[in-house]
């Protein structure tokens, strides 16, 4: 029997909740979107008092399944059971009232409302005159925070909080509904190491209270640290569920990608040509100074350094986003002035920014519109008019080459997985036929399979003579992909290491100097 959300909520409120080993299950679930099967005969089982991680490449179906379980989507086939009874969730509010809360990667709070107002919105306590009882709301919030060991002022406006503290408010809001199922989508993507540790303390405490937590992540170390068990999805299919302490990292990778990955960093020895880009004493007052390096055709120059070292600032200056205070930039031995992105593009330079959502993709536009932005002013203009046919053909070919998973180029970029969004951005710049490619954190926030694809693409570009500058915070990536590694600390270059001599210890010594 399948219960309506209202009936299920009433049963839950009465305390007569059906007993089951599992809090939440999905059986035979299928979900299609135009041209794409997002989920195909998927199953999932969440036990009480456990953290269950979901793993899989971008586009594997993890988020789609969670949106079904949270009432955002409705399955085309299959059944969802809550505490052993079938249920049809028609909306996120239905899910909340039945004890299922989802904390999205993009946090959903009202910035100009207080912490307390955000938590109790539409459920504010009222005084005997029917007005909001702010004093009682503060007390309720303080009691909730005490339970969760959260140290925040209930009266502060959310816009003044860090991302980590906003996440704490979201968790508190979910728990305030007496939720016993909590779904967390990439909760640590914008957190520092200390903030992650605090979040894990709260998750462990919630687990000890019998709450079941679904934890979507790309980070393998988090799975082993916080998850009791995990399920893997691939291409919209359920692959399997295992205890976290019974598998290795390589086991999980094999399950995720469906093949052995013996070489995550397919660096090849390619002929290194002449110097393409030469930077001398480049300075941006107050940010970095006297930065000097060369990059040759076919070379991958890795750039390493801790947060605040100035790596991204150097990239932005090279591309003309923030013009230098002093120093010189030369291309093919000829000094050039690059004080705008347009000038950089004219010199056949391309720049994949660190944050694909804020400074890269135009999320509300489709793939075609995103890909063509950098080339409309020149490459496909004839007699003052844009050749739409040629633009579309070039973008379709690039999409196939990069293996962007999409039914067509009219798909909005916001609907793509992180890895496919990154491919769209790379495709945008490859259409300009660059000679110098600057990549700032090219694989951040994407899954292991998509990372391997991007690494192969970068290697292919180097083989074709492109000079590549690759900024990365992932040490294995820097060591595995670079011909040389430039290390920065507090706005200065502290050393440049050849591939043969570079080790993690040497890089960290230079980065912390």
UniProtKB/Swiss-Prot annotation:
InterPro entries: AAA+_ATPase (IPR003593), ABC_carbohydrate_import_ATPase (IPR050107), ABC_transporter-like_ATP-bd (IPR003439), ABC_transporter-like_CS (IPR017871), P-loop_NTPase (IPR027417). Its EC number is 7.5.2.11, 7.5.2.7. Pfam families: ABC_tran. It catalyses: D-ribose(out) + ATP + H2O = D-ribose(in) + ADP + phosphate + H(+); D-galactose(out) + ATP + H2O = D-galactose(in) + ADP + phosphate + H(+). Residues 24-260, 270-510 form the ABC transporter domain. Keywords: ATP-binding, Cell inner membrane, Cell membrane, Membrane, Nucleotide-binding, Plasmid, Repeat, Sugar transport, Translocase, Transport. The keyword ATP-binding applies. It is an enzyme of class 7 (translocase). This is Putative ribose/galactose/methyl galactoside import ATP-binding protein 2. Part of an ABC transporter complex involved in carbohydrate import. Could be involved in ribose, galactose and/or methyl galactoside import. Responsible for energy coupling to the transport system. Gene3D superfamilies: P-loop containing nucleotide triphosphate hydrolases (3.40.50.300). PROSITE patterns: ABC_TRANSPORTER_1, ABC_TRANSPORTER_2, MGLA, RBSA. One of its GO terms (cellular component) is plasma membrane. Belongs to the ABC transporter superfamily. Carbohydrate importer 2 (CUT2) (TC 3.A.1.2) family. It comes from Rhizobium meliloti (strain 1021) (Ensifer meliloti). It is a peripheral membrane protein. It is found in: Cell inner membrane. ATP binds at residues 56-63. GO terms for molecular function: ABC-type D-ribose transporter activity; ATP binding; ATP hydrolysis activity.
